[in-house]
Regions:
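Short beta-strand scaffold segments in enzyme catalytic cores
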Residues: 31, 79-83, 219-222
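Short, conserved phosphate/pyrophosphate- and ester-handling motifs at nucleotide-, phospho-/glycolipid
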Residues: 33, 183, 245
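Conserved beta-alpha-beta core of the PfkB/ribokinase-like small-molecule kinase fold
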Residues: 118, 124-201, 218-220
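Conserved phosphate-binding/catalytic region of the ribokinase-like
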Residues: 141-145, 192-280
Length: 280
């Protein structure tokens, strides 16, 4: 769950109204895929607290299948406080041993996963607990066993990536994915390259067939099967950029499933991501 001050430049400790919203990269992805017309499901673990119920009700309202969401009384759902400050966005996470981070590999349903077109997971999960890391590895293994595409968004959060091994875990995920959708900055961090062409080449060399680089106001670049398509930036002042990358990644999977041309796919993903920034 995200909690966001409604007043610009307001810090969490300041008095004033705060907006709460069901969030999380994987949940946003699932909702976006559903809104874009694809059947989608969410695999995870929630608590018995009221905010956990808010999350499941949000998923249900967006027609996301929640039949594989486990309810546990072990812990409560994680929180993220988001500040919009003059120096940029700042996250403060309260998710140490949060219930979602305790999903285990043995709690995944192989039959459910085998029936998917693609599975998707964000990189921040790899920085939380041994349990969720094991679940991510099992998700990838089961998907590849059954010919299901693996989609990965590095979604690097500096606040969660203090572990020196974090980069190695991200690289493992890229190497075992069919589709990767980092920002250009994340791609540069993962590859050590600078130019768009070099970043694309280096990421493809790790294994993914489809590489998409988002560039905020400058649009996006998608590369697949030796071809590249560029979507120009859309001139719109963002109200709230939260979820734009997750929505872009969802549109990428939906567009691939629908067999869109590379040029149309780039435009489709870029437009979907841009729509998200027009509201909180």
């Amino acid at each position: 769950v995200d909690l966001m001050p409604l007043r610009e430049n307001m810090r969490i400790e300041d008095p004033g109204p705060v907006l709460k919203a069901a969030s999380g990269a994987a949940g946003i992805f699932a909702c976006a895929a559903s809104l874009l017309g694809a059947p989608s499901g969410f695999i995870g673990k929630i608590g018995v607290d009221s905010l956990s119920r808010m999350v499941t009700e949000t998923l249900r309202a967006q027609n996301v299948d929640i039949s594989h969401v486990i309810v546990s009384n072990e812990y409560q759902i994680g929180l993220a406080f988001l500040e919009y400050l003059p120096e940029g966005r700042n996250y403060q996470y309260y998710r140490n041993r949060s219930v979602g981070s305790l999903l285990r590999a043995d709690e995944l349903d192989e039959g459910y996963i085998s029936g998917a077109y693609a599975v998707h997971f964000p990189g921040m999960l790899l920085d939380l607990t041994e349990e969720i890391r094991g679940a991510c590895v099992q998700l990838v293994n089961l998907a590849r066993k059954h010919g299901v595409l693996v989609s990965f968004d590095p979604n690097i959060r500096r606040e969660l990536s203090a572990d020196p091994a974090a980069r190695d875990r991200m690289l493992w995920a890229v190497q075992h994915s069919d589709i990767v959708a980092p920002t250009l900055a994340e791609g540069q961090t993962l590859t050590g390259k600078t130019s768009i062409g070099d970043v694309l080449h280096a990421l493809h060399a790790m294994g993914p067939r489809v590489v998409a680089l988002t560039r905020d106001k400058d649009g996006a670049v998608i590369s697949m099967d030796g071809k590249v398509a560029i979507a120009a930036g859309i001139n719109y002042a963002p109200l709230d950029p939260t979820g734009a990358g997750d929505t872009f990644a969802a549109a990428l999977c939906v567009g691939l499933q629908e067999g869109m041309s590379l040029e149309r796919l780039a435009m489709f993903c870029n437009c979907a991501g841009t729509l998200v920034i027009t509201q909180r």
